Amino acid sequence: MAAWLVASGSAMAHHSLAGTYDIKSEGKVTGTLVKVAFTNPHGAMTIKVHNADGTDTDWVMTTGSANTLQNLGFGKDGPNTVKAGDTVTITYYAARNGKPLGFIRTITLPDKREITLSNGNSNE
């Protein structure tokens, strides 16, 4: 029983947004998708953002599971497809450690449609 409690606590900590991301701190970036991975338990996108000082920063943006994204029509195929080379705008929950990491809240596709991927649920 004790092992189950420890394991379930670890699983909840792993899947909790609040541990890694500040869901009260939203940011927004526009850039070019470099890499897209639709995987479980969480997908990820790397986006190259051109900074005002002329440098580029690669941001790693986490998403929900491939299954959740597929239910939204978002993925490798479907009505909301994205691929490397696409220019997108992402609103995200910022990483608590200040690094260029985030959990995607919305993504604006090249055709200007905005898709909500997260509502800030602490167990997404």
Show the residue positions of the predicted features:
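Bacterial N-terminal signal peptides
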Residues: M1-S10
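Conserved hydrophobic positions within beta-strands
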Residues: V29-L33
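Short aromatic-glycine-enriched beta-strand elements
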Residues: T39-H50, R105
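A short macromolecule-binding patch
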Residues: A52-S65
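Short nucleic-acid-contacting surface segments enriched for D/E, G, S/T with interspersed K/R
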Residues: N71-T89
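OB-fold/S1-family single-stranded nucleic acid-binding modules
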Residues: Y93-G120
